[in-house]
């Protein structure tokens, strides 16, 4: 799966996460990766599981059907409508979209957000801060999924068409997951948040389908168990520092 760190940077915005999924052709990806023997599911389950069978006739899941235009619509609705000059984004001449930050979005981590190659960063224009549509992706290696994501997502035309810039950093499992995603210094984290996305697997290691720990907001459990570091606005605002 492609997982996101959702408490800073571009991937803290749901519009960006949805746009990413709309510009990855998931059916094509699954067919290519499995040699035609795989199929797409829309969450951490498999169709033979009891949890899925119990709700398969009533559950409604977003299939994120591949659509560049739908991705653009998500970004526009989410406020990614500016260029690096603070003017209206023009796809004919501008490369990367920007979003004007306000309120709790003006966190310390957000204001320092930049691409890992240093090409793009948050800019200040006339007292306003604008964030670039940059996604810093870490890909574990050796990993065939990582290799396929490079062509199916990072360097794909669709990413450029929506005004998104994606950096790729090759990483081993421990430095990527525990160092950059979970920010553990003993695994190489240097104190500066960088990672927005990383690909890794979902394991089915329990007969009980319970993902409560994966989305906990309990501050005693959050850092170790919340897989996406996804807070609601109230939680984020408590940590707000300008």
Where are these regions (language model features)?
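Beta-sheet entry/capping signal
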Residues: 1, 18, 134-136, 165-167, ...
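Extracellular/periplasmic solute-recognition and catalytic clefts
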Residues: 1-7, 27, 31-36, 40, ...
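Extracytoplasmic/secreted cell-surface and envelope-processing proteins
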Residues: 2, 13, 145-147, 178, ...
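Append "and occasionally in soluble cytosolic enzymes with long acidic Gly/Pro-rich linkers
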Residues: 12-158, 242
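Short helices/loops that flank or line small-molecule/ion binding pockets
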Residues: 15, 151-161, 175-195
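Extracytoplasmic/peripheral linker and loop segments enriched in polar/acidic and small residues
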Residues: 30, 166-177, 209-242
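A local structural motif
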Residues: 130-136, 156-177
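Ligand-binding clamshell of periplasmic/extracellular solute-binding protein-like
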Residues: 172-173, 191-215
């Amino acid at each position: 799966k492609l997982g996101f760190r959702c408490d800073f940077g571009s991937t803290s915005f749901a519009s960006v996460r949805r746009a990413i999924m709309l510009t990855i052709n998931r059916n094509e990806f699954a067919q290519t990766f499995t040699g035609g023997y795989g199929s797409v599911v829309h969450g951490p389950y498999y169709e033979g599981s009891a949890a899925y069978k119990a709700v398969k006739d009533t559950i409604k899941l977003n299939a994120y059907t591949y659509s560049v235009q739908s991705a653009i619509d998500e970004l526009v609705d989410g406020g990614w409508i500016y260029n690096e000059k603070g003017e209206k984004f023009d796809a004919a001449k501008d490369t990367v979209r920007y979003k004007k930050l306000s309120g709790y979005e003006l966190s310390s981590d957000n204001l320092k957000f930049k691409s890992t190659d240093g090409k793009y960063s948050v800019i200040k224009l006339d007292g306003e801060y604008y964030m670039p549509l940059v996604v810093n992706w870490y890909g574990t290696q050796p990993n065939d999924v990582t290799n396929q994501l490079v062509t199916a997502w990072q360097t794909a035309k669709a990413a450029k068409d929506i005004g998104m810039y994606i950096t790729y950093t090759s990483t081993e499992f421990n430095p990527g997951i525990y160092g950059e995603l979970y920010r553990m210094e003993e695994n190489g984290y240097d104190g500066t948040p960088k990672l927005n996305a990383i690909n890794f697997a979902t394991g089915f290691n329990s007969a009980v389908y319970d993902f409560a720990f994966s989305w906990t907001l309990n501050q005693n459990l959050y850092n170790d168990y919340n897989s996406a570091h996804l807070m609601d606005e109230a939680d984020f605002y408590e940590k707000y520092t300008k």
